[in-house]
Curated annotation (Swiss-Prot):
This is tRNase Z TRZ2, chloroplastic. SUPFAM superfamilies: Metallo-hydrolase/oxidoreductase (SSF56281). Belongs to the RNase Z family. GO terms for molecular function: 3'-tRNA processing endoribonuclease activity; metal ion binding. It is found in: Plastid, Chloroplast. Its EC number is 3.1.26.11.
């Protein structure tokens, strides 16, 4: 006899059976009930084959949930800075610090980069600069002020040509302030923030950037004076304070590990947050291979870890061949060698469970 769909008794969701069945989908409520039952149920047969399958399903579901949560994270909070973005070797790199209105490289121009006023380009490979015209055009579309884009001086002319081509093809203005900034030069972003490039080593011209906070400190010889006395000296035109630059965030872009051995890059290695690449993570690629491609193997960071004085290291630019779990395993090896907290930027990477 065929039952109508309006039959008042719903069929049970799980039918006990001695036959092998694919483990059912376990809801959180059912999982909790099963775990509770198992704590209070005593039997000579501790776990039947069926309940063993349920237990495995619970464990696998929890692993999957954790892995997906790790993959879906959009950003991290590091040393009071919210840092977000994506950096997949050879595909795209764009790291954003909203608090400072800064973007390091533009990748394919993710939408959340458009609101940031300052863009720092490390080098001219497409996975780092490809979205530049879109970034400029999008700011114009939203009636935002023209961005300030900082580039290595060697590529300024070519970037201008690139923008001019898009102006011609799209018949648009593309308003921008393009600033060539050489290694060692300093540019004031705000009255309390400056930027200074540092030398990196890639297969084409490249440079990293350090963002510094700026504060004024009263010179020692005036420390004993009272407020009115200090004000009087200031009005006379005498400089009574020293300018203190503190490295906050350093971004390397693509580079070999050689930058870590350059004493002129000490500020990058003592910034509160060091954002550095680690393209290769395992023994299937040698350090020589990484060096030839202008990249860094994580073993080279481990080897030179003694030079790192940063509070936090954010690793980026992993090869797309790696899963999130492999990245985290490699990070643990580095973490054991440095006092800094080591965090991987894993947006854009797949989990083994996805």
């Amino acid at each position: 006899m065929q039952l109508s769909s309006s039959f008042p008794i719903s069929p049970p969701k799980i039918f006990p059976s001695t036959k092998h069945h694919k483990p059912p989908v376990i809801t959180h409520q059912l999982a909790a009930q099963i775990q509770s039952n198992r704590r209070h149920f005593v039997s000579p047969v501790k776990v039947s084959g069926y309940f063993s399958s349920i237990s495995r399903a619970i464990e696998e579901e929890e692993e999957y949930r954790k892995a997906r949560a790790a993959v879906n994270r959009k950003g991290v909070e590091l040393e009071s800075y919210a840092i977000e973005g994506i950096s997949v070797g050879g595909h795209e790199t764009c790291v954003i610090v909203p608090e400072l209105k800064c973007v390091f490289d533009i990748g394919r121009c993710p939408s959340r980069a458009i609101q940031q006023k300052f863009l720092f380009i490390t080098h001219a490979h497409l996975d780092h600069i490809g979205g530049l015209p879109m970034y400029v055009a999008s700011r114009g579309l939203y009636n935002l002020e023209p961005p300030k884009i900082f580039v290595p001086p060697s590529i300024k002319e070519d970037v201008e040509k690139l923008l001019e081509i898009h102006r011609t093809m799209g018949q648009v203005e593309l308003n921008v302030e393009l600033i060539p900034l050489a290694v060692g030069e300093t540019y004031e972003l705000r009255n309390d923030i400056v930027v200074r490039p540092f030398a990196t080593h890639h297969v084409i011209p490249s440079q990293g950037y350090v963002i510094y906070s700026v504060r004024k400190k009263l010179q020692k010889q005036y420390a004993h004076l009272k407020g009115k006395q200090i004000e009087k000296i200031k009005k006379s035109g005498v400089e009574i304070t020293d300018t203190i630059l503190s490295p906050e965030i350093a971004f390397t872009g693509d580079t070999t590990s050689e930058y870590m051995l350059d004493p002129r890059n000490a500020d990058a290695l003592r910034a509160k947050v060091l954002i550095t690449e680690a393209t290769f993570l395992d023994e299937s690629f040698s350090t020589e291979h990484a060096q030839a491609l202008g990249h860094t193997h994580i073993s080279q960071i481990i080897e030179n870890a003694k030079w790192i004085r940063s509070k936090t290291v954010l690793l980026t630019h992993f090869s797309s061949r790696y899963h999130v779990e492999e990245i985290r395993e490699a990070v643990l090896k580095l973490q054991s060698k440095v006092s800094a907290k080591v965090i991987p930027l894993t947006e854009g990477f797949r989990s083994r469970y996805s």
